[in-house]
Amino acid sequence: MRVALGVSYNGSAYRGWQSQPGGATVQDRLEAALARFATHEVSTICAGRTDAGVHGLMQVVHFDTPLERTPFSWVRGTNTFLPPDIAVQWARPVPEAFHSRASATARRYAYVLLQSPVRPSVEAGRVGWVFHALDGDAMRAAARHLLGEHDFTSFRASACQAKSPVKTLRRIEITQRGTGGVPAGQAPGDRGDVPTCYWRFEFEGNAFLHHMVRNIMGCLVAVGQGQHPADWMHAVLQARSRDAAAPTFSPDGLYFLGPLYDPAWGLPDRTAAYDWLP
């Protein structure tokens, strides 16, 4: 039978999702736990790989097994053998036609950014950080240039293995929690009394290139700090050159929210942690 799992993890201690020699990845830990519970080797396929330090709210994987267990048995049994920073949230039996990657119609990411004159402490590793006030309207205007189908070469890592740089961004939402933003009489980028707040950037697209979200974040923050006007984003996109864009932003605040599937598969589209993020 084929089983799908929803997996959440804090990626701070791992070298990314994909299995590597040494076993210090989320996939290695998950497959080891599944093998101990199922008493046979298990090979998983995920909806979307994440880099070192990137977190997952609802990574979806599938695997094949001769065992027939109840969904919650897979959840509780696998979690028994997982470390505290990885947890299976749900399990569902699925038809053999289901494929965690190929069946996905979209993927979603969120970046949580702390704006504060003081670096994060309890949130360390779980949020990005800027100590300049950001202009939300400017960042939203810049983000609109990225919506739709484009060649995202300017936001692609040199090690990216995707066959094509052409992807479709369906949605970019930028929201703010707290009293931040640019105070009256203070220009973007001024290092005066920066109000503390959290910014949440949410991205939805058919697929993403390696480092694409982090490279977009670098550009959005540059615009938010007043280093470039909003229409600079269009110029970066049209340049089709990584050199045209801002440096890759920190992985700390990046979360893979999970894939979206046709409702006919009957899989959850989010976990409770979605509403926990600022």
Curated annotation (Swiss-Prot):
General function of this protein: Formation of pseudouridine at positions 38, 39 and 40 in the anticodon stem and loop of transfer RNAs.
Assembly, per entry: Homodimer.
CDD domains: PseudoU_synth_EcTruA
Gene3D superfamilies from the UniProt entry: Pseudouridine synthase I, catalytic domain, C-terminal subdomain, Pseudouridine synthase I, catalytic domain, N-terminal subdomain
Pfam families: PseudoU_synth_1
UniProt GO molecular function: RNA binding; tRNA pseudouridine(38-40) synthase activity
Name of the protein: tRNA pseudouridine synthase A
Residues binding substrate, per UniProt: Y109
Keywords, in A-Z order: Isomerase, tRNA processing
InterPro entries: PsdUridine_synth_cat_dom_sf, PsdUridine_synth_TruA, PsdUridine_synth_TruA_a/b_dom, PsdUridine_synth_TruA_C, TruA/RsuA/RluB/E/F_N
UniProt record similarity statement: Belongs to the tRNA pseudouridine synthase TruA family.
Gene source species: Paracidovorax citrulli (strain AAC00-1)
Reactions catalysed: uridine(38/39/40) in tRNA = pseudouridine(38/39/40) in tRNA
Active site: D51
SUPFAM superfamilies hit by this protein: Pseudouridine synthase
One biological process term in Gene Ontology: tRNA pseudouridine synthesis
Top-rank taxon, per record: Bacteria
E.C. number: 5.4.99.12
